[in-house]
Structure formats: structure tokens, C-alpha cells
Amino acid sequence: MGAGNFLTALEVPVAALAGAASDRRASCERVSPPPPLPHFRLPPLPRSRLPGPVSRPEPGAPLLGCWLQWGAPSPGPLCLLFRLCSCTCFAPLPAGADMDPNPRAALERQQLRLRERQKFFEDILQPETEFVFPLSHLHLESQRPPIGSISSMEVNVDTLEQVELIDLGDPDAADVFLPCEDPPPTPQSSGMDNHLEELSLPVPTSDRTTSRTSSSSSSDSSTNLHSPNPSDDGADTPLAQSDEEEERGDGGAEPGACS
């Protein structure tokens, strides 16, 4: 290939590229809308509503809020959402913010805050519960005997005034406030009385003991009369002496010794 042919081959693409650029510039100039009239211009957004610094928009890179002005191409909803998220959610954090030097302490602080918040809501939302006695207290209360005296908390002021006005020397008036009836027996006291009755034994009196000794002596004499003769058997049969006769013999011997 000669040198002249190489130069002509380079000149043709350069001319084609220059023509394409001029056609694109001409098409952009034709598409751009005409400048709006002054009375159709919208008021700009306040400085607090804008996410970034307020600057004049460039024709190639529109910012958020610049599409409200006439003459600027409006971005699509996806582009607007992406710019909003990039300004709010994906803002760069300061250096060292994501790297906590003591993550365990940070976790404990977070758990402590959650615990305090939970306790606060429990105190507000949950109703106050009354104190309930255990079942053992109820069982002991049922077995206790009734209280006979009036408690200091149950005394009425009117009752005390009436007691002061009434003459206690009068038995009829005193019976109103001081009943003489015996208190009803409690189950524990009645059970103890029954045990005492079972354990107590009747003690014989002197008349009963003398009658018993006379009857025993008469029965012994009758048995001696009906008993066989000792000479018949050839051997004496010993007779059992009762304890009462021994006591009687001891009692009869003592006064003789004293005399």
C-alpha cells in the first residue's frame, strides 16, 4: 500500500466522524424547548428542602429538584428515587464510625437500653396486681379457733360512747355489752375433753370397797362349805387368797399393833 493511499484512508473516517458530530449537535439544538416566558417560571425550592448545595444545573447532569425549572429535562422516577436514596440512605459515614473499638461494651449498652425501655412499658401498660396470700396461709386460717375478744380495729366509737353512758353496776345493762354465756367449744378443745374422759378412771369410794369385801367374804365362806373334806382326799388343797382380803388383813392388824 502506498503512502498516498494510506493518507486518503485516514481522511475519510475523520471527515465521517466530524459530520456525525455536527449532525448530533444540530439534532440537540432542534430538540431543546424554547425558553419559557417569565410569568410561567415556577418558584425555586427553599434551601432546607434541597438535599445538597444549591447550584446552577448543568445541561448534561440534572440534579434533584432542577427538573421543576423550565428548560431542564425531567429525570424519570427511577432516577429520582436513586438520587434521593443516595442523598439520604447511602451517605458516606465518617472514618472509624463502623469500626467500634469495643463491640462488647456497645452490645451491653444496647441491651441495657432495651431492658429499660421494656421495663418502662411494662410499668405503664400492665395493671397493678394485688398481693395474694399463699394457700398455706388459708389452711392455717381455717384451723385457728375463733377470737373471743374484740380487736382494736373493730371497736366502734359509738359503741364506746354507749358503754360510758351505761351504768355497769346494773346487771341487765351490763349483759348487753358483757354477755355471760360460755363461748362455744372449739373442735380442738372438745377433742381434748374427750381424751381426758377416756384417760380418767373411776375411783371406788369407801362404801363400795366395804360392800365388795363383804360380798367376797360371803362367797369365800360358801365355797368353803361346798368344798370337799381335806381328809377325803388325803391332801390339803390350798385356797387362793384374794388381794382384797390381804388388804383387809393388813388393815385389821395395824390397829391391834397400835393398841
Curated annotation (Swiss-Prot):
UniProt protein name: Dysbindin domain-containing protein 2
Purpose of the protein: May modulate the activity of casein kinase-1. Inhibits CSNK1D autophosphorylation (in vitro).
One example of a Gene Ontology biological process annotation: monoatomic ion homeostasis
GO molecular function per UniProt: ATPase binding
UniProt cross-references to Pfam families, sorted A to Z: Dysbindin
Compositionally biased residues, Pro residues: 32-46
Entry keywords, A to Z: Phosphoprotein
Quaternary structure (record): Monomer. Interacts with CSNK1D and CSNK1E.
Family matches, as InterPro entries: Dysbindin
Region of interest: Disordered: 27-56, 174-259
Annotated tissue distribution: Detected in brain.
GO annotations of cellular component type: endoplasmic reticulum; lysosome
Protein family: Belongs to the dysbindin family.
Listed Low complexity bias regions: 205-223
Positions carrying Phosphothreonine: 237
Modified residues (Phosphoserine): 217-218, 242
